[in-house]
Amino acid sequence: MDFSKGHGTENDFVVLPDPDVRIDLSAPRVAALCDRRRGLGADGILRVAKAGALAGAGVLAELPDGTSEDDWFMDYRNADGSIAEMCGNGVRVFAHYLRAAGLESRDEFVVGSRAGGKPVIVHSADGAFGEVTVDMGVVRDLGTSAATIDGKVFNGIGIDVGNPHLACVDAHLTAASLSALDLTAAPGFDPGFFPHGVNVEILTRIDSGAVDMRVHERGVGETRSCGTGTVAAATAALRFDGADSGEVNVRIPGGQVTVAVSGGRATLRGPSVLVASGTLDDGWWNGLA
C-alpha cells in the first residue's frame, strides 16, 4: 500500500492514495498508523479518492455541499481513528499532493471535505514544497464560552469553521507565557456547549498584525499547528479588537500562516511540505484488522 508523508506548518499527515476505495480505514488501523512508535506517526490520515467513489463505497452517505462526484475528496481521520469534518492544514497538503502526484494540473480547483467543497489556489508546488490558499468558507460565531487549564479560566468564543473551536484571547499573555502553558492534558470545556468535543486555541491579542497561538485538538492532543484553529484564532483576535474583518499572521509552534477574514468568510494561506513516500508492508497492515 503506497503512502506519502507531508506536513503543513508541522501538522503532519500520512497521505493514502485510494482511488478505488479499497483501504479499510478502521479506527484501530488509523490509530496504529498514526502512532509515532508503532507506525509511521502522524496527526492524521488523508485518504485520496474521488467524492463519487467514496459515496459509491458507502464512506459518504451523500455528497457534501459544494462537492461534485468528480472532485477529489479529502477523507480525513484523526490520529485516534475518529472521522473529522475538516482540516485546513490537511487541505493544503492534500492539494499539494494532488499536483505533485500528477493527479491535478490546475492551479485552482475544489477539494471536497465533510465540511463542504473547499476552493484552493496552488501558488507553487514541486515534489517537496508548496504554497496553497484555501477558501475556508463561512466562519460562524457560536457564542461565548471558556476553557480551563491548570485551574485557570480562559474566556473565549465558540467558532465553527466546519468543525468546532473555542478560541481564547488573553490580553495578558505574551509569547513566553503562552509557551509555558501545560497543554499535555485536554483543557476543560463545557460539554453542554460543545457536545461533540472541541478544539481549543489559546492566543495572544493582535500585535503588529500578528498573534501567537497554541492548540489542543480533539482526538489528537496538542499539535504544532491547526489550520482551522488558526482561522478561529484570527477571527477571535479581530473581534477582541472590535473588528469584523482584517488580515492576521498567526504564529504557531510549527511556523506561520496568514488568515484573511471578510464578510463572515475566511481564507487561509500557508506552506506545505511533502517529505517522503513509500510502501506499507501488507502483512503489517493486514495484521491490524
Swiss-Prot record:
Annotated site, Could be important to modulate the pK values of the two catalytic cysteine residues, chain positions: 165, 217
Catalysis: reaction(s): (2S,6S)-2,6-diaminopimelate = meso-2,6-diaminopimelate
Enzyme nomenclature, EC number: 5.1.1.7
Biochemical pathway: Amino-acid biosynthesis; L-lysine biosynthesis via DAP pathway; DL-2,6-diaminopimelate from LL-2,6-diaminopimelate: step 1/1
Superkingdom classification of source: Bacteria
Cellular localization per UniProt: Cytoplasm
Binding site for substrate: 11, 78, 88-89, 163, 199, 217-218, 227-228
Keyword Cytoplasm: yes
Entry-linked InterPro entries: DAP_epimerase_AS, DAP_epimerase_DapF
GO terms, biological process: lysine biosynthetic process via diaminopimelate
Catalytic center residues: 87, 226
GO molecular function per UniProt: diaminopimelate epimerase activity
A single GO cellular-component term on record: cytosol
Signal peptide limits: none
Protein family according to the UniProt entry: Belongs to the diaminopimelate epimerase family.
Task of the protein: Catalyzes the stereoinversion of LL-2,6-diaminopimelate (L,L-DAP) to meso-diaminopimelate (meso-DAP), a precursor of L-lysine and an essential component of the bacterial peptidoglycan.
NCBIfam families: DapF (TIGR00652)
Official protein name in the record: Diaminopimelate epimerase
Organism: Rhodococcus jostii (strain RHA1)
